[in-house]
């Protein structure tokens, strides 16, 4: 965004030349500005609410609140509106806050595989706590593609590959989904579903038979079994250690 010319305003008007602003609930400007703006709007408010999940003394209800009110749904608008390269640390901070909220509910530390599984959608045996950083390219790319016809209706034909933010999202999406093609479905739902499946496949290759069976057994109607199975496994381990 270019800075305004001072001569275009009355001489007695004070002006502040800056490339940064916010419009329609989203920041525009430098990566630092966008990053700080999202941390103030999404992360700090969410982290204030996370400690109250434990006070419910009902892990299942707390998990539902975490999933639908304090996790990916809280970030998805920003992910669709802000370029991938403009949130260098906000996504990491937010994902870490969600993980800490989940661990506070279960009282146990999750291993790497359990963390990955918790970020999968329910249909893939997860808890639906999608990582904002992983799904940011899919969200921004989908938003850009869905707006293409509208944008072209107001402007002349555009070379989308020469638009840096779109090209960057396309590149990162190809890294997350190696077999992605331009003619594939551009909706965020489909792109995130493919990302989830690749995550699940990668996680399954590292799971032992018992944990793989647990992963495949968990589905949308029984997502609470994920937490119960994990707790039972940890309690069994603690019992063996005590003996």
How would you describe each model-predicted region?
Residues 1-2, 20-154:
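Non-catalytic, peripheral interaction segments enriched in hydrophobic/basic residues
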Residues 1-19:
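Short, conserved micro-motifs composed of acidic
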Residues 8, 12-14, 25, 103-107, ...:
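Glycine-centered secondary-structure boundary/capping sites
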Residues 82-84, 138-243:
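Charged boundary/loop elements
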């Amino acid at each position: 965004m270019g800075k305004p010319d001072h001569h275009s305003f009355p001489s007695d008007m004070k002006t502040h030349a800056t490339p940064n602003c916010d419009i329609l609930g989203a920041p525009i400007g430098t990566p630092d500005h966008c990053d700080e703006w999202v941390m103030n709007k999404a992360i700090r408010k969410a982290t204030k609410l996370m400690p109250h999940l434990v006070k419910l003394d009902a892990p299942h209800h707390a998990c539902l609140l975490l999933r639908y009110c304090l996790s990916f749904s809280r970030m998805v608008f920003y992910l669709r509106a802000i370029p991938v390269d403009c949130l260098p640390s906000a996504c990491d901070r937010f994902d870490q806050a969600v993980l800490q909220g989940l661990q506070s509910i279960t009282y146990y530390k999750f291993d790497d595989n359990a963390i990955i599984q918790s970020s999968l959608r329910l249909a893939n045996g997860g808890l639906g706590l999608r990582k904002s950083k992983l799904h940011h390219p899919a969200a921004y790319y989908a938003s850009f593609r869905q707006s293409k016809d509208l944008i072209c209706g107001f402007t002349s034909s555009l070379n989308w590959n020469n638009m840096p933010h779109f090209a960057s999202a396309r590149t990162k999406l190809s890294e997350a989904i190696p077999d992605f093609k331009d003619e594939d479905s551009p909706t965020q739902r489909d792109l995130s579903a493919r990302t989830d499946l690749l995550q699940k496949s990668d996680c399954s290759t590292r799971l032992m038979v018992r944990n793989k069976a647990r992963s495949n057994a968990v589905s949308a109607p029984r997502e609470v079994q994920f937490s119960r199975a994990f707790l039972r496994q940890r309690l069994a381990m603690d019992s063996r250690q005590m003996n």
